[in-house]
Amino acid sequence: MSKKLHDNERIKIESNFLRGKLVEGLNDNTTGAFIPDDVQLVKFHGLYQQDHRDYRAERKKQKLEPLYSFLLRARLPGGVVTPQQLLEIDRIASELTDAGSIRLTTRQTFQYHGIYKRNLKSVFQELKFKANIDSIFTAGDVNRNVICTSNPMQSELHAEVYDWSTKISEMLLPHSNAFAEIWLDGEKVHETEQEPIYGETMLPRKFKTTVVLPPFNDVDVHANDLNFVAIVENEKIVGFNVLVGGGLGITHGDKTTFPRKADDFGFIAAEDILEIAKAVVTTQRDLGGRTSRSHARTKYTLETHGVEKFKGEVESRSGIKFLPSRPYEFTERGDRIGWIKGTDKKWHLTVFIENGRILDYPGKPLKSGLVEIAKVHQGDFRMTANQNLIIASVPESEKEKIEALARKCGLINDAHSKQRFNSMACVALPTCPLAMAEAERYLPGLVTDVEALLTKHGIGDDHIILRVTGCPNGCARPLLAEVGLIGKAPGRYNLYLGGNTNGTRLPKMYKENIDEAAIIMTMDELIGRWANERESGECFGDFVIRAAIIAEVIIASKDFHD
């Protein structure tokens, strides 16, 4: 007997191509929330329903419903915006969100937090009509925001991978008019709608796509379902290696869930990229599991059906045969903070945004300062998959002015360490409903403690790739870090060790459910050993494996939990 489909499949089937009862829910002023089915559907429109968890207990005591609000994630393939768009993004954050911030994300876009239901349509309409930005398919069981290498040194090649990311994004958008009808007061469609790529039930689960320019792995290919790795010959992109089946999300206590590195299917010509993307997506649509949400990502489809079957299906659907993979190498993935001169002779300033949170802080008015830069900047802005921002294409004549403005508001801070630049956290508490522990609010202090340990052991100029998430879904990609912390309960985390600096190895759990004091005590001991016993140039992740502190993950489905 076949297993029962997960209830989310019913919701999608009954939704009339993602409409549900959202219009009725918007007009219901008795609550700040949507009905349960529609809470799932709004994700496809780029929204997550949340409540402020710091206020839950007090509101319950006062017999009030939770303080519901919404997160909106913008669709911004490749993460590029103009100064005019950034000014509108800033204005909307200030006028229509409770948080008042712009949150850069690991998906190379931005989020708004704290949008009350009464303001949702206004935010959608202001974004679309004033900034020409939408949030279609940035969440839900679909292809999410397509991300690409943002390092601006090779300007012409970056332009090409950015162009492909936008083309893939456009091709994998829905045909349904539901978004325009509900949020933009668009005309209703009366004829029967079709979704040729997604069908009525969309994909089994989220699907993430990247376009990558080696040697930079800033997008973390092994966190994604589909990756196109550019192969460059004679300074031109001649095609792509196609990597399929990466993903990091796990479930605490469920050893049938595991992170997985993507498999290299082979090489394709550049002109075949869209057909291959469509074939991979539709293969996952038809072969992916729909009974268990925790086993529905592409990585499990490959484990269940085998790489060769999945690959053969992609070749059959696309009519394209994979050629042998071409050689490439990833050597780094962190953003190069500071000024870089591109091949286009223009300057690009990468500024560090701690946790990606653009807001005016006491003595550090990042948000206001960015507005002042946008008013005079002649190039564009590029968001990175490491939650930072590139002020791109600055002419030599404007460089001094841009630097002065960036320093004035704290966007350039020479006191920041390499450790801080290489640390990252998800949002977690107080707004994320899945968070089991702090992440964004915990990270700054944790980094200060780790900086002190590095200095104590005489290696203050070195760094460890450190990432923290409040739950095991992995938004900040801790399972590709040298040190990953995954929230287990308030103030308690699972500690993972053994990833590497270029993002090509998964870490393994070293200690389970430890508190913050135990984390620092453990890191003190490990950093001390690393400082004293490492080989020349040996990174922390390589050291803990060579020293047999932790075993290397070879095949995650077999040895990640051992």
From Swiss-Prot:
Binding residues for siroheme: C475
Reactions catalysed according to its record: hydrogen sulfide + 3 NADP(+) + 3 H2O = sulfite + 3 NADPH + 4 H(+)
Function of the protein: Component of the sulfite reductase complex that catalyzes the 6-electron reduction of sulfite to sulfide. This is one of several activities required for the biosynthesis of L-cysteine from sulfate.
EC number: 1.8.1.2
Name the record gives this protein: Sulfite reductase [NADPH] hemoprotein beta-component
A family per Pfam: NIR_SIR_ferr
Keywords annotated in UniProt: 4Fe-4S, Amino-acid biosynthesis, Cysteine biosynthesis, Heme, Iron, Iron-sulfur, Metal-binding, NADP, Oxidoreductase
Cofactor(s) listed: siroheme; [4Fe-4S] cluster
Keyword 4Fe-4S: yes
The record's free-text note on cofactor binding: Binds 1 siroheme per subunit. Binds 1 [4Fe-4S] cluster per subunit.
Subunit description: Alpha(8)-beta(8). The alpha component is a flavoprotein, the beta component is a hemoprotein.
Top-rank EC class of the record's enzyme: oxidoreductase
Keyword 4Fe-4S recorded: yes
